[in-house]
Amino acid sequence: MKSALNVIGPQVRKYRNLKGWTQSVLARRLQLQGWSISVGSLGKLEAQLRRVPDCEIIFLAKVLGVSTASLFPRIKSLRQLGPQFQSGGKRLAVFPTRSEK
């Protein structure tokens, strides 16, 4: 099982395909907005092989014409995201439970 470095890659691919764009077209449109990204790097992003900083998510949403929230998958459980987000992995954040409030 591959360890995903981002959760938005498949959504980026989905919205790019819905527009009928190649990776080259999307990369060029991102470059015109000021993000120097190569086709190879975009391919790695879509394949979940590279991390995506928050500022890049904003660029992607703007160019694809979608909200930033729409780039994130709908999940019912952290298990859907993969083992790196489950117990035993690194914690992303710790929120108090009702009993701790």
Q: Where are the model-predicted features located?
A:
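A short, Lys/Arg-rich alpha-helix, primarily the initiator
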Residues: 1-19, 28, 99
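Short, charged recognition helix plus adjacent turn
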Residues: 2, 62, 72-101
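Residue-level signal for the short linker/turn that defines the boundary of a DNA-recognition helix
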Residues: 7-10, 21, 25, 37, ...
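Hydrophobic packing within well-folded, soluble alpha/beta domains
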Residues: 12, 16, 26, 60-61, ...
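Short alpha-helical DNA-recognition segment
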Residues: 20-44
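DNA major-groove recognition helix of helix-turn-helix
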Residues: 30, 46, 56, 72-75
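Short Asp/Glu-rich motifs
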Residues: 35, 49, 80-81
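DNA major-groove recognition helix of helix-turn-helix/homeodomain DNA-binding modules
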Residues: 49, 53-70
